[in-house]
Amino acid sequence: MAEPGRPAREAPAASSRKTHRAPRRPRPSRSASGASEPPLRSSVQPACDSAAGTHPVGNTVAMKQKKKKTPNRVSGTNGSEKPSEKPAPDEAPPSAEAQAEQLARELAWCVEQLELGLKTQRPTPKQKEQAVGAIRTLRSEKTPLPRKRQLMRSLFGDYRAQMDAEWREALRALKAATHSAQVQLVSEATRKKSGRVCRPRPAERAKTTPDLTSEEFRFNFF
């Protein structure tokens, strides 16, 4: 119902305002096949898109896997692969002849030490008897080799180390003697002072002995 004092025409005007709506935008027309058009893209694409276009994602994954599978190889100067260095072979054991020579040197050294001890020291009769028996045992060809080595070790301990130390000491003394005996150049002044003057001898010199005669020597007492 209309209020008193207002015309009845305003009511439909208010209802017309409420029902008034904005016009809708026209929808894009679809093709006959019913497929929707692809969205519009800008003509300028970023650099990453171009790079992605040249290298697909699948190729990059395959390249990474290939890099992981290939081992790192050291190449030589000419581009060829450097062969792996083989471990150095172990030194060959000494021959039987070398072992026999080494044993002969060790036996000679031990016998020499025993003989030197008998000459330079004053052993008791018991010690002298033991040293003579050891020398006889070491020189005997019937004595087995293990028995000789056991005897040498019981007498001298580590005789090989003692032989090595003695050899080094002798080599050091020999080097010192060689160094001290080197010929040194003498200066010209020293050479003139110590030089001898050689004078020619006279052609005719007096005879020191009298002439021998064929006459018989006699005492002239009368």
Swiss-Prot record:
Taxonomic lineage of the native organism: Eukaryota, Metazoa, Chordata, Craniata, Vertebrata
Protein family membership: Belongs to the UPF0488 family.
Comp. bias (Basic residues): 17-28
Protein name, entry field: UPF0488 protein C8orf33 homolog
Organism: Mus musculus
Disulfide bridge map: none
Spans annotated as Disordered: 1-103, 119-146, 186-210
Omega-N-methylarginine PTM positions: 27
Keyword Phosphoprotein: yes
PANTHER family in the record: UPF0488 PROTEIN C8ORF33
